[in-house]
Amino acid sequence: MPMQGAQRKLLGSLNSTPTATSNLGLAANHTGAPCLEVSIPDGLFLSLGLVSLVENVLVVAAIAKNRNLHSSMYCFICCLALSDLLVSGSNMLETAVILLLETGALATRTSVVQQLHNTINVLTCSSMLCSLCFLGAIAVDRYISIFYALRYHSIMTLPRAQRAIAAIWVASVLSSTLFITYYDHAAVLLCLVVFFLAMLVLMAVLYVHMLARACQHAHGIIRLHKRQTPAHQAFGLRGAATLTILLGIFFLCWGPFFLHLTLVVFCPQHLTCSCIFKNFKVFLTLIICNTIIDPLIYAFRSQELRRTLKEVLCSW
């Protein structure tokens, strides 16, 4: 298994990252000019992964325990937690295996190591795709619940949600297998980037439309009760702030990784791009951070889920 940087991680085509020498320092590019390189200690990376793992396991356990949470909306949230769990778990597994290989605690044939590496890469890629898909699915579910409130339960039935979930998992596994097999083709990386942009646009359009409807509804209530307009403005500002945080976190955590893939396609040998490639593990760490934040945004805001979570913790 490769030993450092992107060679240690997803997509073997990103194999230009050299060994980091400090936690935060200046590394030299091909011309000797300094470029900023941030090294994430393995201990910190594993710790963040463990936090994400525990957090998402609790979400899955709480939803599985409470039958009142067995609705289409919570099914999507549960699958988001499961995919986030796999994202953090697969990265932790690969990091742990590499550390064992480096220390000599794990000795095996090169072919076995390479097969394990490919399997982990497929798991990582498919769980990332699933995570993005379920973020989009949650946005669609909330959009339908607002704009088709009276028909929501007939549109988003549990069997229909289960079929959508199965389709997402199957498509993600098949796609990731193809992506890892043909990782050295630029079209593969571009497909991943386009998919991320499509999810970003989908979420932005749906949530902005939902915010506009919520502001319109609040304005109607204010007019009905003959209140002053500052209340409506305050509601609009709170909604805009919430939307900015939601989309901002998504973009900041996932964007650098897909920017990295874009640069691999368009400027693999450029000096500036080579400096960015050195921080590949930072981009993966941001994705792990997103898997920690997702439950706070989508799961723990539910009072019913928090109550069930307390029961789960007390039962242990």
Swiss-Prot record:
Positions where lipid (S-palmitoyl cysteine) attaches: C314
Species, as recorded: Saguinus geoffroyi
Location (main, coarse): membrane
InterPro entries listed in its UniProt record: GPCR_Rhodpsn (IPR000276), GPCR_Rhodpsn_7TM (IPR017452), Melcrt_ACTH_rcpt (IPR001671), MSH_rcpt (IPR000761)
Entry function: Receptor for MSH (alpha, beta and gamma) and ACTH. The activity of this receptor is mediated by G proteins which activate adenylate cyclase. Mediates melanogenesis, the production of eumelanin (black/brown) and phaeomelanin (red/yellow), via regulation of cAMP signaling in melanocytes.
Keyword line: Cell membrane, G-protein coupled receptor, Glycoprotein, Lipoprotein, Membrane, Palmitate, Receptor, Transducer, Transmembrane, Transmembrane helix
Coiled-coil parts of chain: none
Name of the gene this protein is made from: MC1R
Xref: SUPFAM superfamilies: Family A G protein-coupled receptor-like
Self-association and partners: Interacts with MGRN1, but does not undergo MGRN1-mediated ubiquitination; this interaction competes with GNAS-binding and thus inhibits agonist-induced cAMP production. Interacts with OPN3; the interaction results in a decrease in MC1R-mediated cAMP signaling and ultimately a decrease in melanin production in melanocytes.
GO terms classed as biological process: adenylate cyclase-activating G protein-coupled receptor signaling pathway
Family assignment from sequence similarity: Belongs to the G-protein coupled receptor 1 family.
Extracellular topological domain residue ranges: 1-37, 94-118, 184-191, 267-279
Any single GO CC term annotated in Swiss-Prot or TrEMBL for this entry: plasma membrane
Source organism, top-level taxon: Eukaryota
Signal sequence segment: none
Cytoplasmic side: 64-72, 141-163, 212-240, 301-316
Subcellular location(s) per record: Cell membrane
Gene Ontology molecular functions: melanocyte-stimulating hormone receptor activity
SMART domains (UniProt xref): 7TM_GPCR_Srsx
Protein name (database record): Melanocyte-stimulating hormone receptor
Membrane topology annotation: Multi-pass membrane protein
Known glycosylation sites: N29
